[in-house]
């Protein structure tokens, strides 16, 4: 039985960064700041919500941008193949109100994410994180119920789950993060990442004898 779960980040790994796309659509360059630049997600989100309020923008405007976002070329095929050989969970600090349309385009994989607090007029008034330090906490919880995790992401907030997993990889990350973490293998293409994940799965697959005695 496959006791592995592959845990992937969403933005920057499978789909373009939502906030960068919205910054370009709305003409507000400050919103291009992401977790690649700011490790403190709580601080980053409060700052983003302040900018949205200042410009009178809400959930509707962001969702209109998200509707036009397509997965990174090759992402859906990568995910389809990966899900055919092992279990996959997307662990993201994004929000369910943002992720829904993107999950449809990716074939409805399982995603663990957070939720926005939205007023009746569409203003985003706050956000609710599922748990603190959600990516790290989630992989540790999976490990506590008998799973081995393999993790990959591109940003500061992915490092916890990558380092806590039996195998972890940077994917499409920044030069600075790669330089700061030379111990982590870093890949740029889905083929490279797939090969790395497959080598981990192969290494931990039970032998036929193990299966016959289980």
Task: Give the positions of each predicted feature.
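Substrate-recognition "cap/lid" segment bordering the active-site pocket of phosphatases
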Residues: 97-149, 180
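Short, acidic/turn-prone active-site loops that include or flank metal/cofactor-
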Residues: 115-118, 173-177, 191-193
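Structured helix-beta-strand junction loops
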Residues: 84-85, 145, 164, 180, ...
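Single conserved hydrophobic/aromatic residue that forms the stacking wall/gate
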Residues: 203-214
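Short, well-ordered alpha-helical microsegments
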Residues: 96-100, 158-159, 194
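Alpha-helical substrate-recognition element adjacent to the catalytic core
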Residues: 4-115, 119-120
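Acidic, Mg2+-coordinating phosphoryl-transfer loop and its flanking beta/alpha structural elements
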Residues: 92-93, 148-186
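Alpha-helical segments flanking ligand/cofactor-binding loops in enzyme cores
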Residues: 80, 140, 159-160
């Amino acid at each position: 039985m496959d006791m592995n779960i592959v845990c992937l980040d969403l933005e920057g790994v499978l789909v373009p960064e939502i906030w960068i796309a919205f910054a370009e659509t709305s003409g507000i360059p400050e919103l291009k700041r992401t977790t690649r630049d700011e490790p403190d997600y709580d601080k980053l989100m409060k700052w983003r919500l302040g900018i949205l309020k200042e410009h009178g923008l809400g959930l509707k405007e962001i969702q209109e941008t998200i509707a036009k976002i397509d997965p990174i070329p090759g992402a859906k095929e990568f995910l389809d193949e990966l899900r055919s050989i092992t279990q996959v969970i997307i662990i993201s600090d994004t929000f369910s109100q943002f992720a829904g349309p993107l999950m449809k385009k990716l074939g409805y994989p399982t995603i663990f994410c957070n939720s926005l607090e939205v007023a009746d007029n569409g203003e985003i008034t706050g956000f609710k994180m599922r748990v603190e330090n959600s990516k790290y906490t989630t992989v540790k919880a999976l490990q506590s119920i008998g799973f081995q995790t393999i993790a990959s992401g591109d940003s500061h907030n992915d490092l916890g789950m990558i380092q806590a997993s039996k195998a972890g990889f940077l994917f499409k990350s920044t030069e600075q993060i790669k330089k700061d973490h030379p111990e982590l293998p870093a890949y740029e293409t889905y083929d490279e990442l797939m090969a790395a994940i497959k080598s981990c799965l192969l290494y931990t697959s039970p032998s036929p004898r193990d299966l016959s005695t289980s």
